[in-house]
Structure formats: structure tokens, C-alpha cells
UniProtKB/Swiss-Prot annotation:
Kinase is among the record's keywords: no
Highest taxon listed in the record's lineage: Eukaryota
Organism: Botryococcus braunii (Green alga)
Record-listed E.C. numbers: 1.3.1.97
List of residues binding NADP(+): 47, 72, 213, 312, 314
Protein name: Botryococcene synthase
A biological-process GO annotation: farnesyl diphosphate metabolic process
Principal EC category: oxidoreductase
Function: Produces botryococcene when coexpressed with SSL-1. No activity with farnesyl diphosphate (FPP) as substrate.
Annotated Mg(2+) binding sites: 75, 79
Protein family per UniProt: Belongs to the phytoene/squalene synthase family.
Catalytic activity: C30 botryococcene + diphosphate + NADP(+) = presqualene diphosphate + NADPH + H(+)
Keywords (A to Z) from UniProt: Magnesium, Metal-binding, NADP, Oxidoreductase
Keyword flag Ribonucleoprotein: no
Length: 383
């Protein structure tokens, strides 16, 4: 975190300090060395995710930490381009059969995940300490996710429905299994079990933001990883690899705004899902990443920096949003504020201007109606 950046935004100093205090107070300090290693590793591979997990009821924190590391191993296997696709398919399909084997570790590893893979049996030891029901949740998740991941090792993303499916394959099974866990612990409405579509939209919204933000890294891979659908980029470019070239900036921005506008359609079902979460900690666990995704869309909109590096929100901005998520009315206000802010910077010359504005106005109207409904419930209780 840069001091100059903090001083340039003094309104973010207090939220940053509050976040630091919260992180310190909620830091897990397990006595068990393997469990302590799991938490330390989670901090290394996904620092931002740690504080979200720490919002959960204490009974869920260790299982979700272990779950994340198990899935990170699976994700590392999926993305390891050093392994030919035809060899990765059976490995992904069989992954779930090995997560209880203390002698096994995923046959992959690169970058920041090398230590996780090398020490993977430590994750297995903690997995085996979980109750049988939590072990089964994680096993089911890996079985379904591994199967879904193989789909796009064999096919390309050509259409918007393909993008929906790709975003779902990387997050959907996780969202569905976590929903079952929330309901099983009586932290969410059982009706969510009949609405896998809502879990799917939660997953797709998160998945698409990652696909959008990682475009430069993906097209520079050898061979390139093409997750933006040709149905979108083909309207502006002949070759998606041109999207990072300065001479194609106008076309690249139109393409970017198009795919961002597509992602906005997931917001309504995401809000419907979060309305059905009862527990405050689980609510925050679900709501914070979705809110950050909308904020990231706003930051990325018409932003050429998407094609020159990774676009990130300031830590102070992140802290303010994180602290704003206290309940559903507060979430409505935050979603509406970001949508209004993004609408104000929409570019009239953009080919998708009208649709982008409409979807953002729909979000604001939805949040306004949700707030009115919430206020009505409060009034009824007080009557």
C-alpha cells in the first residue's frame, strides 16, 4: 500500500485502519501446526479471501479454509499449461478420489502455488479431521467441479452462452455446494436448494469479472487462453490478440464495454440469492465478493489500463465497501450507488451505451424497490 495513495484519499484512512484492526482481531491462530500452515498458505495465495472467510461463523472457518486450498489445488491443475490438455482431463475427473489420500499431491504446480502443491498432504491431514458431512460436501464439490473443468479443455468460448457456461464451470459447483452447507447449518433459506439458478448467477458474476480483468495475461499465454466469446469480440476485432495493441484501443474499449454490460445482467438474481441468506457472517461472505465485482466493473468500464496491466481498486476503496456490507438494506444502497456512479461515466459514443445505461438504471430501480420493501418490514415490526 502506497502512503501517497492513502494521503491523496483521506476519506479512506479510517476505513483502512478499521479493516486492519478487524483483520488483527479475527486472525486465526491455531495451535495445530498443520492447520496453522493452511491459514498461512491461504494468506499467501489469496490474502483478500482470508478476511471474507473470517466473517463466517467460527464453526465454518476452518472447513472453508481447507475447502479453498483443496479447490486451489484443483484449479492449479486445470490451469497448468505445461500438462497437455488430453492428460489433464483424466486427472481433473479423478481428483476427488484422492483428496483423502495422505500420500497424494496434485501432479502440477507453478508460480505462487508451488509450495501449496509440494506440501499438499498437510491440507489432506486437515481435510481428514473435518466431520464426515463437511468432507462429503468438499468431495462432491471437487467431483462436480473437476468434471465441469474438462469441458473447456476440449472446446472454445464462441458465444455468450459459452461464456456463461465457462464462468459457471469455475465457480458454479462451489456456489451450489456452499449453498447446501448454509442450508444444512440453518444459515440460509431452504428454498435456495430449489434455486440452483441463483447460485449459478452468483458464480457467473464472479467468474466473468476474473475473465474480463485477466484479458492481457490470458492472450499473452502461449498458446493464448481465449475466454472472451467471439460473439462479442468478433464485432470489433479480427483477432482477439489485437485487443492489447495500442492501435486498436478504440475497438478494444468498445469490446470491453460490451462484455462488461453482459455481466450486469447477473445482478438481479444475485440480489435475490442474498435476500435468502439469514446468518450475518454468511451474508457478508456471499455479499462482499459480489459487491466488489460490481465495483470492479465500474473501474474497468472504458478503461484502457485493462489492456496494459491488472486493474485493481485502491485498498481504501475496498475497505469502505467491505465495511458497508452490514445487511441487505446497506447492500442495496451500495449496489445502487456504484450503478449510479457508473451510469454517470457511460460514454455516449459507445455502441452499447443505451443497453449499459438501461441495465444500470434497472439495478438502481431494483435496489430502490428492495429498500422500500425492507423499510416496510421494519415498520410492520414496529407497529
Amino acid at each position: 500500500m502506497k502512503l501517497r495513495e492513502v494521503l491523496q484519499h483521506p476519506g479512506e484512512i479510517i476505513p483502512l485502519l478499521q479493516m486492519m484492526v478487524m483483520a488483527y482481531r479475527r486472525k486465526r491462530k491455531p495451535q495445530d501446526p498443520n492447520l496453522a500452515w493452511c491459514w498461512e498458505t491461504l494468506i499467501k495465495v489469496s490474502r483478500s479471501y482470508v478476511l471474507v472467510i473470517q466473517q463466517l461463523p467460527e464453526v465454518l472457518q476452518d472447513p472453508i479454509c481447507v475447502n479453498y486450498l483443496v479447490l486451489r489445488g484443483l484449479d492449479t491443475l486445470q490451469d497448468d499449461m505445461a500438462i497437455p490438455a488430453e492428460k489433464r482431463v483424466p486427472l481433473l475427473l479423478d481428483y476427488y478420489n484422492h483428496i483423502g489420500d495422505i500420500t497424494w499431491k496434485p501432479p502440477c504446480g507453478y508460480g505462487q502455488y508451488v509450495e501449496l502443491i509440494e506440501e499438499y498432504p498437510r491440507v489432506t491431514k486437515e481435510f481428514l479431521k473435518l466431520n464426515k458431512q463437511d468432507q462429503q460436501f468438499i468431495t462432491d464439490m471437487c467431483m462436480r467441479l473437476g468434471a465441469e473443468m474438462t469441458v473447456f479443455l476440449k472446446r472454445d468460448v464462441l458465444t455468450v452462452p459459452d461464456l456463461d457456461l465457462y464462468a459457471f464451470t469455475n465457480n458454479g459447483p462451489v456456489a451450489i455446494c456452499l449453498t447446501k452447507l448454509w442450508v444444512d447449518r440453518k444459515f440460509a433459506d431452504p428454498k435456495l436448494l430449489d434455486r440452483e439458478d441463483l447460485s449459478g448467477h452468483m458464480a457467473m458474476f464472479l467468474g466473468k469479472i476474473n475473465v474480463i480483468r485477466d484479458i492481457k495475461e490470458d492472450v499473452l499465454e502461449d498458446p493464448p487462453r481465449i475466454w472472451w466469446p467471439k460473439e462479442i469480440w468478433g464485432k470489433y476485432l479480427k483477432d482477439l490478440r489485437d485487443i492489447i495493441k495500442p492501435e486498436y484501443q478504440k475497438e478494444a474499449l468498445a469490446c470491453l464495454n460490451d462484455i462488461l454490460t453482459d455481466a450486469l445482467r447477473h445482478i438481479e438474481p444475485c440480489l435475490q440469492y442474498m435476500e435468502m441468506v439469514w446468518d450475518e457472517g454468511v451474508f457478508k461472505f456471499c455479499a462482499v465478493p459480489e459487491l466488489m465485482s460490481l465495483a470492479t466493473i465500474s473501474v474497468c468500464y472504458n478503461n484502457p489500463k485493462v489492456f496494459t496491466g491488472v486493474v485493481k481498486m485502491r485498498r481504501g476503496e475496498t475497505a469502505k465497501l467491505f465495511l458497508s456490507v452490514t445487511n441487505m438494506p446497506a447492500l442495496y444502497k451500495s449496489f445502487s450507488a456504484i450503478a449510479e456512479e457508473m451510469e454517470a461515466k457511460c460514454v455516449r459514443e459507445d455502441p452499447n451505451f443505451a443497453l449499459t445505461v438501461k441495465r444500470l438504471q434497472d439495478v438502481q430501480a431494483l435496489c430502490k424497490a428492495g429498500l422500500a420493501k425492507s423499510n416496510g418490514k421494519v415498520s410492520a415490526k414496529g407497529a
